[in-house]
């Protein structure tokens, strides 16, 4: 990382403009998170939902990924979930339908058309999710006897329109960051959602840590600290694990396979051109954080459907089971989901999560890394890999290398995604105090990966805008 170059690039007006655009959009996003949905008495409903979050694992998870949007019962409650789901649908269809595959390979024009269709599909998905969320929350709040009013048809229509508009605004803000700022807009907004929950989680952890009802910590017989002794050692162990995960994530994100590209000499008149060497870096995890986001979004849908059916039919045991199985197990909801301790059902979500992360890593890499296109470009430019024939042979060679890299990268990413499940389980077994989902798990994985990717893009743009200084 060239920090001196980044500091020097801040003198460039375009660089400053892009940075301020990103910061301004993220501030606007956080302001939107505090605009309530117009559903009856907004304050009463907000207080009732906040009370529900502390009791329900499902609503707690929604609150995390919406950046506190649920606790505020804000217009961005639905978030980017419809847009992500729509993206998954079209990326799957582009591999299954030949005409869509041709369109996706038709350069910028084709990609722009598919992006437009993705946005259009996201709108009805946002409407459906808005209706589902409002119904689930209303039924849950009413059943907990914290609210006693019946929404009118006008309340329903206005609330659904408002939440759908909030999701569309988020989608637009994400695209603004991608086009006019730095980094991937969708990833940045999800990053900001998770980061915004860190202060409240750390505050809750600190409050529990200094709760000395169970005695204070006697350190080596000569120092007594006013902290919960069990929770102190659990927190310390988790802190060490988090540091190790951070270190491993950084190493994995920086790992790459370097392939040397040779360029043939060309004689033009009395001058010779080419004959130089270049490199083609192949990252161990080319897909970045996208597989994790896709896997989380994919697994949240069955939980939403199960919760919706349970709200409509209280006695539906199957719907309740589906909702529990597809709810991410963590320290805060472990004893609610598994009061009798760990059983075979506990392994279903982590196993599916691991499998989806691996599959989406392969799938997304095949989309963003087109070996045939790279091989064709190299052949047109007179480039070749030593010992490999240009053209289809080069494409097959690159495909073989990427398959091997993906095997290790996908397994490593999946394994890291599994570590928080284990640490949360250990934490709840040793202490009744929940550590909080946002301290680890998917949140940590997304935060680290997005931060590294954006630092890399910031570094690249800084080198580009300061290039003239090196001439």
Region locations from a protein language model:
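N-terminal cationic and glycine-rich segments that engage phosphates or anionic surfaces
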Residues: 1-104, 108-471
């Amino acid at each position: 990382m060239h920090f001196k170059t980044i500091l020097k690039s801040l003198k460039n007006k375009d660089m400053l403009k892009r940075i301020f655009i990103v910061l301004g959009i993220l501030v606007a996003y956080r302001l939107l998170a505090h605009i309530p949905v117009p559903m009856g008495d907004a304050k009463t409903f907000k207080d009732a939902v906040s009370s529900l979050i502390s009791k329900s694992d499902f609503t707690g998870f929604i609150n995390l990924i919406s950046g506190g949007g649920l606790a505020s019962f804000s217009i961005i409650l639905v978030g980017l979930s419809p847009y992500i789901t729509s993206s998954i649908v079209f990326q799957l269809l582009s591999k299954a339908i030949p005409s869509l595959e041709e369109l996706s390979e038709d350069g910028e024009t084709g990609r722009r058309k598919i992006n437009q269709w993705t946005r259009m599909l996201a709108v009805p998905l946002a409407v459906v999710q808005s209706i589902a969320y409002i119904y689930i929350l209303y039924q849950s709040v009413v059943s907990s006897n914290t609210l006693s009013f019946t929404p009118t048809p006008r309340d329903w229509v206005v609330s659904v329109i408002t939440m759908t508009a909030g999701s569309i605004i988020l989608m637009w803000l994400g695209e603004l960051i991608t086009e006019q700022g730095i980094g991937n807009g969708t990833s940045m907004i999800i990053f900001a959602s998770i980061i915004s929950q860190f202060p409240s989680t750390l505050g809750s952890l600190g409050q529990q840590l200094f709760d000395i009802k169970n005695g204070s910590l006697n350190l080596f017989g000569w120092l007594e600290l006013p902290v919960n002794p069990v929770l102190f050692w659990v927190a310390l162990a988790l802190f060490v694990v988090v540091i190790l995960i951070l270190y491993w994530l950084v190493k994995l994100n920086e790992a790459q396979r370097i392939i040397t590209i040779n360029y043939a000499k060309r004689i033009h008149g009395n001058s010779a051109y080419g004959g130089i060497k270049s490199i083609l870096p192949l990252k161990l995890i080319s897909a970045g954080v996208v597989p994790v986001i896709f896997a989380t979004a994919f697994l949240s849908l069955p939980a939403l459907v199960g919760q919706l059916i349970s709200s409509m039919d209280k006695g539906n045991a199957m719907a309740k089971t589906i909702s529990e199985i597809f709810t991410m197990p963590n320290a805060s909801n472990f004893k609610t989901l598994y009061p009798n301790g760990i059983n075979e059902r506990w392994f279903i979500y982590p196993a599916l999560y691991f499998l989806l992360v691996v599959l989406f890593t392969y799938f997304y890499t095949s989309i963003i890394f087109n070996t045939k296109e790279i091989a064709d470009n190299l052949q047109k430019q007179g480039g070749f890999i030593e010992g490999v024939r240009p053209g289809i042979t080069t494409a097959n060679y690159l495909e073989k290398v990427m398959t091997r890299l993906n095997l290790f990268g996908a397994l490593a990413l999946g394994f890291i995604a599994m570590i928080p499940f284990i640490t949360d389980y250990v934490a709840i077994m040793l202490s009744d105090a929940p550590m909080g989902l946002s301290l680890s798990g998917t949140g940590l994985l997304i935060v680290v990966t997005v931060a590294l990717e954006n630092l890399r893009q910031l570094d690249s743009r800084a080198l580009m805008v300061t290039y003239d200084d090196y001439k």
